[in-house]
C-alpha cells in the first residue's frame, strides 16, 4: 500500500490516506483555487492571477514547466533498479511511493503542457517521454538527473539534498502568476515533504548503524577500517 495525499485544503493542510498499490491511480490533483488571487510579485504585482497563458510570457512559462517536468521521470529512471537491493520492506515501500509520486508529478506537468500550450505543448510533452536519464543521445536536461544512483546511500543522499532543492523550486513555482501552475505545485509540495523524510531518516539510520558497528568493534577512529 501507499500512504499518499489525496487533497489539500485552502490553508495548505494535506489529507492523507492509505491506498493499495493495485488501486493507485495517477490523477490531476490541484490545490483549491484561491478566490480573487493576485500575482504576488514582479511587474504585474497585484493584478489578478492569470487563468490562461499570457502571450508575452508563453515561452518562458513553457520552458519552466518543461524543465520541472523533465526532472520527475528522470529520478524514477535513476532509482527504479534499487528495488532489487532494498534493505527492508519498509525501504522498498518508500522507494515505490517516491517513484509513483514522481511519476504523477510528470503527469501533472504534461497536463499543463497539453491543456494550455497547444501544439508546442504537445510536442514538448512527447519529448519528456523521449529523453532518458544518462542516455548518450537524448539525456535529461539537468546534469544531476543524468548521474547514476548505484546504491541506497546515494538514494538517501538524493532524497535529502536534491529533493530539498526541488522543494525550493516548487515553492517558487507555487508563487507563479499563472494560477494553474501555482495550484499544481502547491499540491506537489504535499508529496515532496515525504521524499525529504525518506532521505533524512535514511541517512540517520546509516549513521546510527555505523556508530553502533564501530562501538561493537571497539573502533574510535573512523579511518581505522582494517579492524
Q: Which role does the model predict for each range below?
A:
Residues 1-93, 115-149, 153, 227:
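Terminal targeting/low-complexity segments that flank the catalytic cores of oxidoreductases
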Residues 68-76, 98-113, 131-138, 159-166, ...:
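Alpha-helical transition-metal enzyme core signature, strongest for iron centers
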Residues 93-97, 183-186:
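Short, charged, amphipathic alpha-helical segments
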Residues 116-117, 202-209:
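C-terminal transmembrane helix end/exit motif
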Residues 148-194:
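Internal, conserved structured core segments that host functional sites
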Residues 208-227:
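C-terminal, helix-dominated tail/subdomain
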Amino acid at each position: 500500500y501507499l500512504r499518499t495525499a489525496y487533497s489539500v485544503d485552502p490553508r495548505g493542510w494535506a489529507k492523507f490516506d492509505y491506498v493499495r498499490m493495485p488501486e493507485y491511480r495517477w490523477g490531476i490533483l490541484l490545490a483549491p483555487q484561491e478566490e480573487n488571487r493576485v500575482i504576488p510579485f514582479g511587474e504585474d504585482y497585484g493584478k489578478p492571477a492569470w487563468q490562461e497563458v499570457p502571450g508575452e510570457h508563453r515561452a518562458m512559462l513553457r520552458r519552466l514547466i518543461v524543465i520541472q517536468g523533465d526532472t520527475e521521470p528522470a529520478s524514477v529512471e535513476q532509482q527504479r533498479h534499487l528495488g532489487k537491493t532494498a534493505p527492508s520492506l519498509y525501504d522498498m515501500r518508500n522507494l515505490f511511493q517516491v517513484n509513483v509520486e514522481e511519476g504523477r508529478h510528470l503527469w501533472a506537468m504534461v497536463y499543463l503542457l497539453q491543456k494550455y500550450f497547444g501544439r508546442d505543448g504537445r510536442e514538448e510533452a512527447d519529448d519528456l517521454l523521449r529523453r532518458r536519464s544518462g542516455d548518450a543521445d537524448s539525456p535529461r536536461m539537468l546534469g544531476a538527473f543524468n548521474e547514476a544512483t548505484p546504491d541506497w546511500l546515494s538514494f538517501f543522499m538524493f532524497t535529502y539534498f536534491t529533493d530539498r532543492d526541488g522543494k525550493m523550486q516548487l515553492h517558487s513555482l507555487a508563487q507563479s502568476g499563472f494560477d494553474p501552475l501555482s495550484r499544481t505545485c502547491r499540491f506537489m509540495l504535499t508529496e515532496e515533504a515525504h521524499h525529504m523524510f525518506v532521505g533524512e531518516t535514511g541517512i540517520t539510520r546509516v549513521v546510527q548503524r555505523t556508530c553502533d558497528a564501530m562501538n561493537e568493534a571497539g573502533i574510535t577512529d573512523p579511518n581505522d577500517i582494517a579492524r
